[in-house]
Swiss-Prot record:
Pfam families: TK. Zn(2+) binds at residues 145, 147, 182, 185. The gene is tdk. GO terms for cellular component: cytosol. It is found in: Cytoplasm. The active site is at residue 88. It comes from the Bacteria. It catalyses: thymidine + ATP = dTMP + ADP + H(+). Homotetramer. This is Thymidine kinase. It comes from Novosphingobium aromaticivorans (strain ATCC 700278 / DSM 12444 / CCUG 56034 / CIP 105152 / NBRC 16084 / F199). Keywords: ATP-binding, Cytoplasm, DNA synthesis, Kinase, Metal-binding, Nucleotide-binding, Transferase, Zinc. PROSITE patterns: TK_CELLULAR_TYPE (PS00603). Belongs to the thymidine kinase family.
Amino acid sequence: MAKLYFYYASMNAGKSTNLLQADFNYRERGMATMLWTAALDDRGGERAIESRIGLGADAHRFDAGTDLWQRISAAHAVQPLSCVLVDEAQFLRRDQVWQLARVADAAGIPVLCYGLRTDFQGELFEGSAALLGIADSLIELKAVCHCGRKATMNLRVDDSGAAVRAGRQTEIGGNDRYVALCRRHFSEAMGQ
């Protein structure tokens, strides 16, 4: 039976790298995969998914209006898929997570989702909350805080490096905008 997996972590834990390695493992064995990432995250440029260590791959892009069940099942009818991999899964809508569960349950295709658990204020993203609720398997990937502890929080910083305490939930950026911290150092930086 195929499953819905959620690999979650803070920034800089290697989520995209893990996704690209899993994709390579399937393709190396001659199996077809389908990669997805959020349309609003354009940091990869030409390559829709790109890791900090330089690996990258083309991917389909989803937005709030994408019917993932329809798009994936249509592709599967043309060429059987062995796996669907979704990067930036925190940006999925709740109904899209249920569509991915249907891909696993009805089409029998494993779905591997990778994303952040929480935003810069420690709040769950809609997609992450839905995945934490219904995924068959939850796998935490580890990042490291500057103190050596496990980093579980994402601190947003401004141009001078000061903690940002308010703002939109979604602001695309990498190491220049976010710092992965343990809860203790996140709390200190946020003045809590």
